[in-house]
């Protein structure tokens, strides 16, 4: 996908726009943070403003399932069928709210 965005990169279409990432893994230690960080790199090359989840979000410190400061995440279980936990839902919504709030502040 990113290889097809050369024209947008060259023209700066996404520069200054807020962006966030999210992922799902089978286990709690299945590479969520490294995946989220890797997904940020093309966004940074495009000049996006990366939005994460700050630790002012209480569920970030207490989640036993998904959710990191780098973005929302879900632990799907080995069979991929685990339902979203309440923490995961709250953190995903918090990330969405932050993207919307920052979009408004940036006029993006």
What are these model-predicted stretches?
Residues 52-108:
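Glycine-rich phosphate/pyrophosphate-binding loop and the adjoining helix
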Residues 1-61:
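Helix-loop-strand module that forms the ligand-binding subsite of alpha/beta enzymes
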């Amino acid at each position: 996908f990113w290889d097809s965005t050369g024209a947008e990169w060259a023209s700066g279409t996404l520069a200054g726009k807020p962006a966030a990432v999210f992922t799902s893994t089978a286990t709690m230690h299945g590479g969520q943070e490294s995946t989220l960080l890797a997904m940020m790199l093309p966004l940074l090359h495009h000049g996006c403003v990366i939005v994460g989840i700050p630790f002012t979000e209480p569920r970030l410190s207490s989640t036993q399932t998904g959710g990191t400061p780098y973005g929302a995440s879900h632990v799907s279980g080995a069979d991929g069928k685990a339902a979203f936990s309440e923490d995961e839902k709250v953190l995903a919504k918090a990330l969405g709210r932050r993207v919307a709030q920052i979009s408004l502040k940036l006029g993006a």
